Swiss-Prot record:
Purpose of the protein: Together with its co-chaperonin GroES, plays an essential role in assisting protein folding. The GroEL-GroES system forms a nano-cage that allows encapsulation of the non-native substrate proteins and provides a physical environment optimized to promote and accelerate protein folding.
Family: Belongs to the chaperonin (HSP60) family.
GO cellular component term, pick one: GroEL-GroES complex
Gene source species: Vibrio cholerae serotype O1 (strain ATCC 39315 / El Tor Inaba N16961)
Transcription found in the keyword field: no
Record's protein name: Chaperonin GroEL 1
Gene that this sequence comes from: groEL1
Length: 544
């Protein structure tokens, strides 16, 4: 076992604080509308330029192991804020740094660290309640666009495209961000339910221009098994032919004689038909077939529940206004399912999302909700160079998370104003003893730090602005982008309540642990073993 280096008390805390400050100083320059860029060196390729706090934090690893422990703990604050709300990482880092610096000064002055921590916790719990009271719902497209704009470092084009995407696919729709091919941002919206399975035979294609299968007002047959025998399909095919409507077959697979017969019938024009494989695998496939059944008002023909394909009738088939199938994807538009049944299914999947433990499962379940509830939007980020593209994609993803958080818990005045208003309401808060009161004051003073940093990054005088904002009321604050005082919500400077709340809670949690640290242990570097002595081959010259 390797030897350890152990440090105690003030000696340990000083080193830890140095690490905290190195990481926080690198991250906090990105805060606000006039936040600066940070350039990250990469082991290969061009350096990355970013204004995303968590991206900067993730890159930092310090040589001194005691300093590094402090830096890693603040990195944890940024990561937790990012996981919970998807944004607010820089605010969380700035708050953590302020609480740790003020808290450790009090510890050095002889205060009891445990009482300090209790005071900080008490102040944060009260501040969170005040933030909830200050929160206003974020319902309209304009407010959503404003939140997105602020989170994307005051880039209004990003805010507008996110608001447009949310308007088109609804609050539950899936919005993904991809790298585009053009210079401008683009928005692609897929309406209806799309799944990643294409036609089983190119002979089903009826739109030669686009190379796709287009079926208008089709019946949809859903089967939870492989179909290889055409006899099983005959009753359904005859019924569909009499109705003179097209048929889409979604099954585990259609092969051999069955596929060949369908192709021949389609080419001769006897019955317009197309077949695709069911999406997903295993239990997920069964669940997605059931989703399609509910969306289209059909039934999944499955032997598990006693239904046989030979006995299927037109009543068992789903229906839709249109189906479009390409080589890779199938899209069902305007299914004929009962709206109450669809809403019930969505509620059921939401419950599964609440109970899911893995991120992968949650993501897949969220996709299913979106496909049932509205659709999928893809924001394609455009830029002139790859470096700019990566930087912008980071900002768009941040803005997307921020708008989702805003819709969930509402918004408060941005620019650090909400924290100052919450702190001013708690001026009469007292703890159980004087040391807890110091802890409360540490937390309340730290809540000014985000505003001060935003002003500093904009090149203005932080103390003057902080005093002016503190003297104001309600949403009165400072717009660092224009240098104007006014109502922050009217100026469109909004922060999601969830982002501000999460930043404060996680910052206080980790800062409290650091203030109460009394010893730090790290591994000593291993000393290299001495080299083998030179054996020397002297006196052996003359050997042939």
């Amino acid at each position: 076992m390797a030897a350890k280096d152990v440090r105690f008390g003030n000696d340990a805390r000083v080193k830890m604080l140095e690490g905290v400050n190195i990481l926080a100083d690198a991250v906090k320059v990105t805060l606000g509308p006039k936040g600066r860029n940070v350039v990250l060196d990469k082991s290969f390729g061009a350096p990355t330029i970013t204004k995303d706090g968590v991206s900067v934090a993730r890159e930092i690893e310090l040589e001194d192991k005691f300093q590094n422990m402090g830096a890693q703990m603040v990195k944890e604050v940024a990561s937790q804020a990012n996981d919970a709300a998807g944004d607010g990482t820089t605010t969380a880092t700035v708050l953590a740094q302020a609480i740790v610096n003020e808290g450790l000064k009090a510890v050095a002055a002889g205060m009891n660290p445990m009482d300090l921590k209790r005071g900080i916790d008490k102040a944060v719990i009260a501040a969170v309640e005040e933030l909830k009271a200050l929160s206003v719902p974020c319902a309209d497209t304009k407010a959503i666009a404003q939140v997105g704009t602020i989170s994307a470092n005051s880039d209004s084009s990003v805010g507008n495209i996110i608001a447009e995407a949310m308007e088109k696919v609804g609050r539950d729709g899936v919005i993904t961000v991809e790298e585009g091919q053009a210079l401008q941002d683009e928005l692609d919206v897929v309406e209806g339910m799309q799944f990643d399975r294409g036609y089983l035979s190119p002979y089903f294609i009826n739109n030669q221009e686009s190379g796709s299968v287009e079926l208008d007002n089709p019946f949809i047959l859903l089967v939870d098994k492989k179909i290889s025998n055409i006899r099983e399909l005959l009753p359904v095919l005859e019924g569909v032919a009499k109705a003179s409507r097209p048929l889409l077959i979604v099954a585990e697979d259609v092969e051999g004689e069955a596929l060949a017969t369908l192709v021949v019938n389609n080419m001769r024009g006897i019955v317009k038909v197309a077949a695709v494989k069911a999406p997903g695998f295993g239990d997920r496939r069964k669940a997605m077939l059931q989703d399609i059944a509910i969306l289209t008002g059909g039934v999944v023909i499955s032997e598990e529940i006693g239904l046989e394909l030979e006995k299927a009738t037109l009543e068992d088939l789903g229906q839709a206004k249109r189906v479009s199938i390409t080589k890779e994807n199938s899209t069902i538009i305007d299914g004929a399912g009962d709206q109450a049944a669809i809403q019930g299914r969505v509620a059921q999947i939401r419950q599964q999302i609440e109970e899911a433990t893995s991120d992968y499962d949650k993501e897949k379940l969220q996709e299913r909700v979106a496909k049932l509830a509205g659709g999928v939007a893809v924001i394609k980020v455009g830029a002139a160079t790859e470096v700019e593209m990566k930087e912008k994609k980071d900002r768009v993803e941040d803005a997307l998370h921020a708008t989702r958080a805003a819709v969930e818990e509402g918004v408060v005045a941005g620019g650090g104003v909400a924290l100052i208003r919450a702190a001013s309401k708690l001026s009469s808060l007292v703890g159980d003893n004087e040391e807890q009161n110091v802890g409360i004051r540490v937390a309340l003073r730290a809540m000014e730090a985000p505003l001060r940093q935003i002003v500093k990054n904009a090149g203005d005088e932080e103390s003057v602005v902080a005093n002016n904002v503190r003297a104001g009321e309600g949403n009165y604050g400072y717009n660092a982008a224009t240098g104007v005082y006014g109502d922050m919500i009217e100026m469109g400077i909004l922060d999601p309540t969830k982002v501000t709340r999460s930043a404060l809670q996680f910052a206080a949690s980790v800062a409290g642990l650091m203030i109460t640290t009394e010893a730090m242990i790290t591994e000593l570097p291993k000393k290299d073993a001495p080299a083998m002595p030179d054996m020397g081959m002297g006196g052996m010259g003359g050997m042939m």
